[in-house]
């Protein structure tokens, strides 16, 4: 059986393979299978991970578990502590957190018990000394973080700033450009942190094959190209 073809039911209570129910049981919740063929499930005994045959990977049960990314899975222990485990069910580091994300590019955002966010590496080590009000996933070596001032900046994998500009809100880069908001509205910026056009929008989306959906300040919906020129009005 090819685990990549295993699907979750629409109500997320069981698994299907080529339209047939797997493992002969319903769960409270099932999540998708991830490499190398492991899925997170929740039943009356608690949260745990199973392989493609439906066999639990370990005996311990958690309050909740999530999928594997970079060979690490986020779990919530019964005392409320969040941390990561490896594919054998072994805890990856000693520290517990108020929340942990999923590893992306071998780095992960975490929320400290006393408040604030940081990034940890695959061994649970902080990658910089700063504590931020918020931080997100790394994508292509860059993450968006919220400073104590409330503004957002882009940082690289070593914690240094990618460019000198701060914004009211800031997304990660997608195909060379990121969405950003200043006091005038939303725009797209390049890797230097500068806007790629002069106009501002009420709402925008990342570029998709050279085009992006935007809502003008007057409410008109458009599609623009990477020069900021209107391709069509919707």
For each of these PLM feature ranges, what is it?
Residues 1-234:
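Residue-level detector of conserved, function-critical positions
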């Amino acid at each position: 059986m090819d685990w990549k073809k295993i699907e979750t039911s629409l109500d997320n209570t069981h698994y299907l393979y080529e339209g047939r129910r797997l493992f002969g049981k319903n769960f409270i919740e099932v999540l998708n299978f991830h490499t190398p063929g492991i899925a997170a499930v929740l039943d009356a005994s608690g949260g745990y991970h199973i392989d493609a045959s439906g066999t639990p990977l370990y005996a311990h049960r958690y309050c909740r578990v999530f999928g594997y990314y970079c060979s690490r899975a986020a779990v919530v222990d019964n005392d409320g502590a969040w941390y990561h485990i490896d594919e054998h069910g072994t805890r990856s580091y000693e520290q517990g957190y108020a929340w942990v994300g999923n590893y992306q590019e071998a780095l992960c955002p975490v929320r400290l018990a006393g408040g604030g966010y940081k990034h940890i590496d695959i061994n649970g080590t902080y990658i910089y000394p700063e504590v931020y009000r918020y931080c997100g996933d790394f994508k292509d070596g860059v993450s968006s973080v919220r400073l104590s001032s409330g503004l957002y900046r882009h940082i690289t994998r070593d914690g240094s700033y990618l460019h000198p500009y701060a914004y009211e809100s800031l997304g990660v880069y997608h195909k060379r450009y990121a969405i950003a908001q200043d006091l005038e509205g939303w725009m797209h910026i390049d890797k230097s942190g500068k806007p790629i056009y002069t106009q501002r929008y009420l709402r925008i989306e990342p570029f998709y094959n050279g085009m992006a959906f935007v809502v003008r300040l007057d409410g008109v919906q458009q599609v623009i190209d990477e020069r900021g020129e209107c391709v069509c009005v919707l």
